[in-house]
Amino acid sequence: MEFNDKIKQFSERVVKIKDTALTEESTKMSLIVPLFQILGYDVFNPLEFCPEYTADVGIKKGEKVDYAILQGGNPTILIECKSCTEPLDKHSSQLFRYFSTTTAKFGILTNGIVYKFYTDLEEANKMDLTPFLEIDMRNIKAVSYTHLT
């Protein structure tokens, strides 16, 4: 199956099951992890797709971002997940804290339906307050597919 077809099929799945994945954990397992698998990540290899990645903030130890995509043992993308019933507006500060303590260059905040992509375009090593890309999986268009690859 072609990538575009997989994404379209997954988008339809999101619409169908979003009302049953009510907890953060069920959102991760039914909506978020499957998308990263479609994108080509080995979600079962913690050397590539690491769950509960430690991103200690200052004196606060044990802080963990939901997932980190690793290259050579270093995080390149941090993924902070919320329940699909949770609006994302109030949660970027959590990702902001994690971003500043790691070598990651991209951060994704998602509830499995909406994906907000952040980086540090405005100031090096400091996550921008505004996402450079936002994708709603319920309304994904062919033009959005190119942003995912």
What is the meaning of each model-derived region?
Residues 53-55, 71, 82-85, 139:
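Short, flexible loop/turn elements at secondary-structure junctions
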Residues 46-72:
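Active-site metal-binding core of divalent-cation-utilizing nuclease and nuclease-like domains
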Residues 67-69, 73-83, 98:
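Conserved catalytic cores of phosphodiester-cleaving nucleases, focusing on short active-site segments
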Residues 1-39:
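Charged, often low-complexity linker/regulatory segments
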Residues 146-149:
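Conserved small/polar residues in nucleotide/adenosyl-binding loops
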Residues 90-93, 99-128:
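Nucleic-acid nuclease catalytic cores
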Residues 112, 129-140:
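Conserved beta-strand -> loop -> alpha-helix junction used to position metal-binding or nucleic-acid-contacting
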Residues 40-46:
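Short secondary-structure junctions
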